[in-house]
């Protein structure tokens, strides 16, 4: 059986950023044909298990599609399929591996609502999506109706260069695409990851784009929009808050040495030099706490 399609045209460096289900680009007739083509592909190689068949769809002739590859596993974006089908794909995969039959037939598969996933990357979009590394200082993940977050983030985690820069997935589901987009926008605004650069602000710019909102998307849109995006620059106030945060963390170490500036007769000021790039005052300054 097949569980519908996913739209994955929004990509950077040929890697997906935003995925959604169902696709806004397919007609019902094309949707049925592409689903059957996926089933036929699996049957042709006697494949048993959960898998993902990927197709390229013509931008000029959206009723035409071409086989690209088959991945014999679940994909990163499988949560959007779970959200609109109500099927736990991991559970089904394990059942199949254990020799059990599928728990449902094709006629029992129903697609309800719309679900969109945003991949949170440790990277700097305005620097050509260069990866970002560092130690996570604080994490706050969004909650609310229709919001699901798949991540392993925690305070103190070290983000290095050994693995893919994806650090979390934010999935928003609604009764329709507009509601799913609105919920995703709010969830991205609520997500906080301190200590590294992320693409959170970029993702918000992307899903607010008029063509994205209208469903006019293709694999070239990400590169076309990036040069015109304006990102918030850190201000002196942000740097001051960061210094306060570092100071509060330093006052609770695991050893006996406290950087509290203790002197006979009272504590001395603790000074931090903050270097930061900012549009309003690109400089460095000292702050005493």
Predicted regions, residues:
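Beta-strand scaffold of nucleotide-dependent catalytic cores
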Residues: 1-12, 64-71, 79, 130-131, ...
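A short, sequence-level motif marking secondary-structure junctions
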Residues: 7-8, 287-289
